[in-house]
Amino acid sequence: MASTASNTSKLEKPVSLIWGCELNEQNKTFVFKVSDEDKSEHQLALRTVCLGDKAKDEFHVVEIVPQVEGSDVQPVPIASLKPSILPMATMVGIELTPPVTFRLKAGSGPVYISGQHIALEEDYSWAEEEGEEEVEEEEEEEDPESPPKAVKRPAASKKGSQAKKKKMDKDEEESSEEDSPVKKGKGAGRGRKPAAKK
């Protein structure tokens, strides 16, 4: 949907509705329009054009007739359907601003056109949000001091952690030697292998 910027300070929120119409032998044209009293911006995004189950096996051509006055502008075909070949066409990127006239140029139908009717309604909740933002700004100005942020230290590299581990192992050995009673005599120190008997 192409959105245009509004000159007013009011925000617009989209309201989306499913839309559809039927073209047949009795009703070969359909005009999608909105009331003149409605000040919202409207768009019609087409999604599918499909044949009904009672459609004859003939070509059904659906076209859009421009609303421009003058004979220079030709109708634009948007789908050519036949039940045995192509019973449905998906529309992508066709977004129209009302009024839009659809016409069944060839075939007897029924042909169903569906899409999404999007209306941008004025949103007055912006005034409430703006008031809340002003209150928050005043609270921030009253309490300018904020607690200092904790600074993280960089992680130690592998070399540093290996050296630290060796140092801790050495400290543990020294502390265990200090805590243990001093051994005296021949048993102190390295042990000897008993001699083998002959």
Swiss-Prot record:
It holds the Pfam family Nucleoplasmin. One of its GO terms (molecular function) is RNA binding. Keywords: Chaperone, Chromatin regulator, Developmental protein, Fertilization, Nucleus. Expressed in oocytes. Residues 150-167, 183-198 have a biased composition (Basic residues). GO terms for biological process: chromatin remodeling; positive regulation of DNA replication; single fertilization. Residues 125-145 have a biased composition (Acidic residues). GO terms for cellular component: cytoplasm; nucleolus; nucleoplasm. Residues 128-145 are annotated as: Acidic tract A2. Residues 35-38 are annotated as: Acidic tract A1. It is found in: Nucleus. Gene3D superfamilies: Nucleoplasmin core domain. The keyword Lipid metabolism does not apply. A motif (Bipartite nuclear localization signal) lies at residues 152-167. Residues 172-174 are annotated as: Acidic tract A3. The record marks D57, K82 as: Interaction between pentamers. Residues 125-198 are annotated as: Disordered. Belongs to the nucleoplasmin family. Homopentamer. Acts as a chaperone for histones, such as histone H2A-H2B, and thus regulates the assembly of nucleosome cores. Involved in chromatin remodeling, especially during fertilization and early embryonic development. May be involved in sperm chromatin decondensation during fertilization. This is Nucleoplasmin. It comes from Rhinella marina. The gene is np.
